[in-house]
Amino acid sequence: MQVEVKLKENAYKVYIDELEELEFDSKVFILSNPKISGLHLKTLLSKIKAREIFIAAVKDGEEYKNLSTMEEILNQMFNSKLDRKSVLISFGGGVISDMGGFAASIYQRGIDFINIPTTLLACVDAAVGGKTGVNNNFGKNLIGTFYQPKAVYCESSFLKTLSSRELAAGMAEFIKMAAMFDDSILDFIEKIDEKSFLNATCENEIFTQIIARSIELKSRVVEQDEKESGLRMLLNYGHTFAHVIENFTDYKLYLHGEAVAIGMVMANQLALNLGFLDKMQSQKIKDILLKFGLPISYKINNVDEFYEAFFMDKKSSNKKINFVLAGPLGKGLIKGDISKEDIIATLREFQ
């Protein structure tokens, strides 16, 4: 199965379960992590033909997605004597995808890169759309670029080695898509047998459908708003809260998808308080998140500090915070005129 991301420039295809032989008349630099290298690198190498192949495995996890790791990656790229015709392959989850794309975008002012995601979260979100970057002390993904891959290959077979926690985190991003753009997908999600899904014993077709439907939705959004000036901001549903939570917990307590799950619950509470969402729909999202074992609560110790952290969000402008809300489910909206009092009141509900 193929989905084309039809951009005015740099259009590319996403191949689902179609990873066959990849031939390059250039050097290839594979960026991965030790776990994925141990599980799947042999499979990938059997499919690649290139002049030379270099492999770099860096520590994986949001706490390592920083400029220090980026410098380590770039040093290995320079030591490999890559040129502008070389190709970087990001082979891993969302962290590897973000860092690999960023490295490709700044190495000698840009070389081609391909994403081969190995987590559900990366398949449904991080690997498609061209957002790259790293975190710093001020927040998440505040240093980065928009830089599109030349192709994306999503293989459902790689997902079979994921833990239930990793699969659930990926499902959170799929739920996000449904809540923003197509609430009928929520009905599909409710019918999934969570036990076989979380054990990765479900049929490959389930993974394929999740990946395909996510990418079809996201590609349409990116085609209309590549640089996130409007519509694409809806893909950040739950993320305004999630990024603060991740930063406050040093990126160690929650997987990204888990933080997004909590963020969606918080965003829904704000939408509920403002009258954009009703209790039944808010509860529906909670029930689906709980179905897959995702967290739905976070204790805010300092409301004022949490509120101030919102202003480091990339969607904030002119001293206003742009919140992405569901209202109703399947129809996202962006609100930049919510009073501080209303925001604080919602945050106090999570103390």
UniProtKB/Swiss-Prot annotation:
Its annotated compartments are: Cytoplasm
- The EC number(s) attached to this protein equal 4.2.3.4
* UniProt catalytic activity: 7-phospho-2-dehydro-3-deoxy-D-arabino-heptonate = 3-dehydroquinate + phosphate
The cofactors named for this UniProt entry are: Co(2+); Zn(2+); NAD(+)
Q: Which domain of life is it from?
A: Bacteria
Main location (coarse class): cytoplasm
What would be one Gene Ontology cellular-component term for the protein? cytoplasm
Cite the entry's keywords alphabetically.
Answer: Amino-acid biosynthesis, Aromatic amino acid biosynthesis, Cobalt, Cytoplasm, Lyase, Metal-binding, NAD, Nucleotide-binding, Zinc
EC top class, as a word: lyase
Q: Kindly state what the record says about how the cofactor is bound.
A: Binds 1 divalent metal cation per subunit. Can use either Co(2+) or Zn(2+).
Question: Pfam families annotated for this entry?
Answer: DHQ_synthase, DHQS_C
Question: What terms describe the molecular function in GO for this protein?
Answer: 3-dehydroquinate synthase activity; metal ion binding; nucleotide binding
Record's InterPro entries? Dehydroquinate_synthase, DHQ_synth_AroB, DHQ_synth_fam, DHQS/DOIS_N, DHQS_C
For the ligand (NAD(+)), the binding residues are 60-65, 94-98, 118-119, 131, 140, 158-161
| Any one GO biological process | amino acid biosynthetic process
Recorded hits in CDD domains, A to Z, give: DHQS (cd08195)
- Involved pathway(s): Metabolic intermediate biosynthesis; chorismate biosynthesis; chorismate from D-erythrose 4-phosphate and phosphoenolpyruvate: step 2/7
Residues reported in the UniProt entry to bind Zn(2+): E173, H239, H256
Write out the function statement from the record.
Catalyzes the conversion of 3-deoxy-D-arabino-heptulosonate 7-phosphate (DAHP) to dehydroquinate (DHQ).
**HAMAP family given for it?**
DHQ_synthase
Per the record, the similarity remark reads: Belongs to the sugar phosphate cyclases superfamily. Dehydroquinate synthase family.
Q: Know the name of this protein?
A: 3-dehydroquinate synthase
Organism (species): Campylobacter jejuni subsp. jejuni serotype O:6 (strain 81116 / NCTC 11828)
